[in-house]
Amino acid sequence: MKRNFERNDDDKPERKRPALASVIVEALKVDSLQKLCSSLEPILRRVVSEEVERALAKLVPTRLTTSSVFSPKRIGGPDGRNLQLHFKSRLSLPLFTGGRVEGEQGATIHVVLIDANTGRPVTVGPEASLKLEVVVLGGDFNNEDDEDWTQEEFESHVVKEREGKRPLLTGDLFVVLKEGVGTLGEIVFTDNSSWIRSRKFRLGLRVPSGYCDGIRIREAKTEAFSVKDHRGELYKKHYPPALNDEVWRLEKIGKDGAFHKRLTAAGIVTVEGFLRQLVRDSTKLRAILGSGMSNKMWDLLVEHAKTCVLSGKLYIYYTEDSRSVGVVFNNIYELSGLITEDQYLSADSLSESQKVYVDGLVKKAYENWNQVVEYEGESLLNLNQPERLDISQTDPVTALASYSTVPLSQFPEFAIEGYNQTLTTALPHNPQAQFDFVPQQDQFIGIQQPQTQTNIENENVTRLVLGPPQSSTGGYQDIKSSADQENLNPFEDWTNLSENDFFSEEEIRQTSHDLLANEDMQQLLFSMGGGKGEDGFTFPSFMQNTPMMQGYDEEGRGRSGKAVVGWLKVKAAMRWGFFIRRKAAERRAQIVELHDNNDGK
């Protein structure tokens, strides 16, 4: 029996053992399923919770009193208004976790309550002082920019924090309206937006439950935006970029990307280096980046780079060892101006002939950049700038101190065609007299014929005065007696003169035209350069000794001093024309007003 029993056991087939690979696969499946369940659980819990809350919200009104059942929320206000909340500020993007939510350029974010029927803010009533709640919406809410949505649609897109995470939005989450306008406080995102379907958020504003029962106020929403992890802020672009920023801080240049590597290989590692190469040879810079950068990308890159704030560092390239003439560059090697014999001319003020000359110097400087030196002298603003020489300025003594001892014998007269008399500035003919020109502020300088020159002596100062204006018969009015000359007052009230004492507008125009068309005047203006000052007059370049200024170095004065003297005479002639024109216009206005008053009586 025993043997038979053992035989029966031996006859049973042995159980097949599983292979090691199949065991591992089964274990991985179980582990994956457990992980999937653990990840789905918080999502399912949240969805179920939201659905339960929504179902309860629908059931609550049926349990209230009959008065509440038959008074549903209206779309507008009690007087038919269509009330809507609106954000009036755009957000500063990109946003990072832990960073404060701000408006563009750090501005405050404002919200306003408006009546959509009129488009005007609601400033009165209980709605104008509501308390609002800030919430987070999914970026896919109202993608069609439909202006009409229901409260249920808005609430269904409110985003809550992830399971086990901090509240998605922290800070001051309530806004109180004052006369229909409110300001968002300090709010911060604690989580990024990469975990939701749209991968973007929106900020929303709503009226909390319990406020304005029976009145529907449409909620506000911002544009969709991404919230990145704060660790990504290390790779953030700078607006505007700084000169010492690494070049990948610029738009379209990714850190350790292809463009970044090409620029680094070419020795361009900072924004300053990028701008310098852009100024000196933009074609070469474009070639360094290669064909992978499109024209649109290039334009955006250059536009962003040019927003960089420059420092005050200057460089200068001298044309000769004497260092009397040189071109000035800023710290990105862009032309700033020209220095010639202690005179500084900005690049914008150069005449066409000067620009041709300066362009040659700039090219030579770029070719011999090792000879360019950093400017370590005084500020260029402290150098004599001819465009700033204004004889009507408050302190003319300082501006013209170096020209106060030029002998009057050196002043040439201007022969103006079309006139019977020779014009000259109202200066004494005494060759021993010194040019001590100190006009008062707002005092106008005129032109007189030699026979009518008038001097006003006050504290040993010789002043230039404006002779009486021309009558309508044409020509310059003569002074009848020396007594009249002595009684002339440059500060007298010209409005007391009769209408016939002033030029007509046509005569003034013809006078100015003849004055500027004169050959000597044109020669002087051409030789003195073509820049323009603040008042529209040209000013000298002081780059060369013009024919009109030759022969005036007997007293050892520099060429620039003689040019300024000639310029003052030209400016006096110009001011004379403008002064007469203005006074004539004022006089005509007074006459018209007087006639209107007489007609009214």
From Swiss-Prot:
Q: rRNA-binding among the record's keywords? A: no
Q: Name one GO cellular component term.
A: nucleus
Principal subcellular localisation of the protein: nucleus
Output the superkingdom of the source species: Eukaryota
UniProt-annotated stretches for the region DNA-binding: 144-267
Q: How does it assemble?
A: Interacts with calmodulin (CaM).
- Name the chain's protein: Calmodulin-binding protein 60 D
User: Where does this protein come from, organism-wise?
Assistant: Arabidopsis thaliana (Mouse-ear cress)
